């Protein structure tokens, strides 16, 4: 799914990455919230795939830093997650249980999805008396 959002002009370059840690209070009061931070999820990482051109100087200014804002197309980055299942098939869809994060650090709790699509198996590791897979997964929610 294509997501168009706003980012400051100095950061707007194709291939650039950023992570939304937390949405600042000032953003909730901004008239551009719905097309800027409102389209992004805290804790998730994004990659800029396209910078949309503006024919005129941007009328959009960020309330936090005063920078000129430009529209960009972003793609959500995949997450590295532990999955504790008897077997994993790349391309399969599974539920994610945050209790699996005991042996491997996970993204922040608000970034954890309830369902994921397994993109790639990275490793198999032992945790206590059991095993889990470390996978690259695409969040489905």
UniProtKB/Swiss-Prot annotation:
Pfam families: UPF0179 (PF03684). InterPro entries: UPF0179. Belongs to the UPF0179 family. This is UPF0179 protein Cmaq_1008.
């Amino acid at each position: 799914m294509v997501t168009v959002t706003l980012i400051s002009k100095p950061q707007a370059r194709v291939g650039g990455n950023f992570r939304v840690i937390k949405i600042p209070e000032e953003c909730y009061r901004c008239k551009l919230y719905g097309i800027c931070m409102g389209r992004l999820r805290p804790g998730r990482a994004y990659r800029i795939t396209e910078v949309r051109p503006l024919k005129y100087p941007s009328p959009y200014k960020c309330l936090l830093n005063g920078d000129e804002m430009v529209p960009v197309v972003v793609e959500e980055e995949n997450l590295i997650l532990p999955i504790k299942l008897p077997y994993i098939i790349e391309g399969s869809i599974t539920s994610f249980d945050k209790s699996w994060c005991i042996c491997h650090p996970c993204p922040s709790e608000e970034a954890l999805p309830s369902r994921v699509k397994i993109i790639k198996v990275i490793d198999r590791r032992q945790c206590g008396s059991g095993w889990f897979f470390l996978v690259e997964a695409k969040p489905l929610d």
